[in-house]
């Protein structure tokens, strides 16, 4: 198989000093999004999956993503085709990672699956290569146990769509080196991402823990017939969702309380009453799940548009929002 690698590289210090070659292991939704991002930034990419059918489907999605970026003026004219030429497909993990400087793993979130893949990547990738996982909730301390070079293993969890949303959560396991954490942080900045490095591991990291808390309350409101799924989404999008692209929960309470200290003094009691009435279940009750599914299926946008149409509309709105935020 012909090896053609880009001259574009990221230069930092130590591990990850010269990232030219990127491998994406797992070609599902997350893997194809990463491939879109890496190729759009000029890196040569090997996109790997055991299934040739998944690879072919993934490449169609990558092409669509790149054409969208070009149409949105986030890639120059002809940029989509140029980026596509930088991607090769491969069904074998060993062949995909054997020349890589940076590997982004995006296989299913299951410890057994991750460990099997990491063991092979660790054996076949060059010693200097960083092995990053897209896991949305697993702990790297557990995954890296099967590797002989655990210091280079790290979590780099994106938010979909990866090629548009800037955030990347970075977390190390007990044996991950500081050098690896800093190298991934700097590489993500070079890609135009906004990295946040966790001080320590926690299941679900930041975004998914916040989303899990919000989703449980949303499901409970629908289950108790307080409101429909459509109106929950409306309240979010036209309320906190509209306000919070600029501020997070802590800056919000600082503003709402006219100082965070005053917020703690004046609002603690009202929040205590709310928290007392909130659900604490850790798995969705079957009847609540049925109600949620039925209510979501009744939403106007779900009834009238396909998943692909909703995704395209979402991405178009994200581009507009990002342009406004970046203009400051």
Question: Which role does the model predict for each range below?
Answer:
Residues 2-10, 14-18, 41, 182, ...:
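NAD(P)-dependent Rossmann-like dehydrogenase/reductase catalytic/cofactor-binding core
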Residues 9-72:
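NAD(P)+-binding Rossmann beta1-loop-alpha1 motif at the extreme N-terminus of oxidoreductases
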Residues 33, 162-171, 190-191, 196-226, ...:
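Active-site-proximal catalytic alpha-helix in oxidoreductases
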Residues 45, 103, 131-132, 153:
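Hydrophobic/aromatic residues located in beta-strands of well-ordered beta-sheets
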Residues 58, 121, 143-144:
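Hydrophobic packing residues within well-ordered alpha-helices of enzyme cores
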Residues 71-130:
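Rossmann-like NAD(P)-binding element
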Residues 133-200, 204-208:
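Rossmann-fold dinucleotide-binding core
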């Amino acid at each position: 198989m012909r090896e053609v690698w880009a001259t574009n590289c990221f230069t930092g210090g130590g591990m990850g000093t010269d990232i030219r070659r990127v491998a994406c292991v797992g070609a599902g939704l997350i893997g194809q999004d990463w491939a879109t991002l890496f190729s759009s930034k000029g890196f040569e990419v090997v996109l790997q999956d055991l299934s040739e059918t998944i690879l072919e489907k993934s490449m169609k999605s990558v092409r669509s993503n790149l054409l969208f970026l070009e149409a949105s003026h986030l890639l120059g004219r002809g940029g989509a085709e140029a980026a596509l030429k930088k991607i090769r497909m491969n069904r074998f993990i060993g062949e995909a990672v054997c020349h890589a400087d940076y590997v982004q793993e995006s296989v299913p979130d299951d410890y057994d699956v991750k460990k099997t893949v990491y063991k092979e990547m660790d054996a076949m990738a060059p010693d200097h290569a960083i092995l990053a996982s897209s896991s949305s909730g697993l702990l790297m301390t557990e995954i890296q146990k099967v590797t002989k070079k655990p210091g280079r293993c790290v979590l780099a969890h994106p938010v979909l769509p990866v090629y548009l949303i800037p955030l990347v959560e970075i977390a190390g396991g007990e044996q991950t080196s500081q050098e690896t954490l800093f190298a991934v942080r700097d590489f993500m900045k070079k890609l135009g991402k906004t990295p946040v490095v966790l001080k320590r591991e926690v299941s679900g990291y930041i975004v998914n823990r916040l989303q899990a808390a919000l989703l449980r309350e949303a499901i409970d409101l629908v289950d108790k017939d307080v409101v429909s799924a459509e109106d929950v989404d409306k309240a979010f999008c036209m309320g906190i969702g509209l306000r919070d692209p600029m501020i997070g929960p802590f800056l919000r309470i600082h503003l709402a309380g006219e100082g965070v200290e005053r917020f703690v003094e004046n609002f603690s009691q009202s929040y205590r009453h709310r928290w007392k009435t909130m659900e604490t279940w850790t798995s969705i009750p079957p009847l609540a799940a049925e109600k949620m599914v039925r209510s979501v299926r009744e939403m106007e946008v779900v009834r009238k548009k396909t998943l692909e149409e909703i995704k395209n509309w979402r991405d178009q709105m994200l581009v507009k929002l990002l342009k406004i935020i970046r203009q400051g």
